[in-house]
């Protein structure tokens, strides 16, 4: 991980409903698709959603989105839904800073554990998640349903 001055100039910041204007400039590949204003407003307005941005010179260069899952029979947990850093700034410590920030926010909101999944062939993501010191769980099957 080659941290450099560009990465040091990046601000890591949790965002909420009042921060929608920050999404006016988003670097390539930070999100999987275009940010839609109505979906962004709904996401940021949900009390169990957490989003942390990496900002450089007013541009979103990274993000992590997470959801708090509340259970009637188990401790609350944080699901890391999406992590993205623009390719020009990857492998410079920004992803780790985003994950550290979202973990801290999850802890502060009562979560006792966090979990994340990624594709087996996504080696950069797997390397990052491994460096964060998880307990690797056994493989599971995921199912997707169109509603």
Question: Which role fits each region the language model picked out?
Answer:
Residues 3-6, 10, 14-75, 81, ...:
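Acetyl-CoA-dependent GNAT
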Residues 96, 120-139:
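Conserved active-site alpha-helix within GNAT-family acetyltransferase domains
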Residues 115-125, 144-147:
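Conserved beta-strand-loop-alpha-helix junction that forms the acyl-donor binding cleft
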């Amino acid at each position: 991980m080659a941290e450099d001055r560009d990465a040091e100039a990046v601000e890591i910041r949790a965002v909420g409903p009042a921060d929608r204007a920050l999404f006016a400039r988003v670097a390539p590949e930070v999100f999987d698709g275009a940010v839609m204003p109505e979906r962004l407003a709904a996401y940021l307005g949900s009390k169990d959603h957490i989003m942390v941005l990496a900002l450089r010179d007013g541009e979103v260069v990274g993000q992590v989105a997470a959801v708090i899952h509340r259970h009637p029979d188990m401790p609350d947990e944080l699901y890391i839904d999406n992590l993205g850093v623009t390719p020009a700034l990857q492998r410079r410590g920004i992803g780790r800073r985003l994950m550290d920030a979202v973990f801290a926010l999850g802890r502060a909101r009562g979560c006792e554990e966090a979990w994340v999944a990624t594709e087996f062939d996504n080696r950069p993501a797997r390397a990052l998640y491994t460096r964060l010191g998880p307990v690797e769980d056994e493989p599971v099957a995921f199912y997707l349903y169109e509603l």
